[in-house]
Amino acid sequence: MATAIVRSALSRAVTRAAPKTSVAPKRNFSSSAGHDDAYEAAKWEKITYLGIASCTALAVYVLSKGHHHGEDPPAYPHMHIRNKEFPWGPDGLFEVKHNKEH
């Protein structure tokens, strides 16, 4: 029994003193896995820079062009008919006071 306790204490001391590796082993399914990763990363970095440049050029082009403003709607005579006076006077709340057109 004493030998089991000593053996357990020694194995525990050895496992505590042993350097711990926190890096998990990497599974390579092909012999050139590291090369493919670097190639793919470089490829997508180039695609990203190309995308940023093309989107910036497109934005500059679109924003530099003027845009067409629509025509004013026709002044229909039935739009400002008032059959009853407002309680606050002849002008509407959001109209310019003393507007002669309406």
Swiss-Prot record:
Keywords: Membrane, Mitochondrion, Mitochondrion inner membrane, Transit peptide. It comes from the Eukaryota. Gene3D superfamilies: Cytochrome c oxidase, subunit VIa. Residues 1-36 form a transit peptide. The keyword Mitochondrion applies. GO terms for cellular component: mitochondrial inner membrane; mitochondrion. It is found in: Mitochondrion inner membrane. The keyword Mitochondrion applies. Its main location: mitochondrion. InterPro entries: Cyt_c_oxidase_su6a (IPR001349), Cyt_c_oxidase_su6a_sf (IPR036418). This protein is one of the nuclear-coded polypeptide chains of cytochrome c oxidase, the terminal oxidase in mitochondrial electron transport. PANTHER family: CYTOCHROME C OXIDASE POLYPEPTIDE VIA, CYTOCHROME C OXIDASE SUBUNIT. Belongs to the cytochrome c oxidase subunit 6A (TC 3.D.4.11) family. This is Cytochrome c oxidase subunit 6a, mitochondrial. The gene is COX6A.
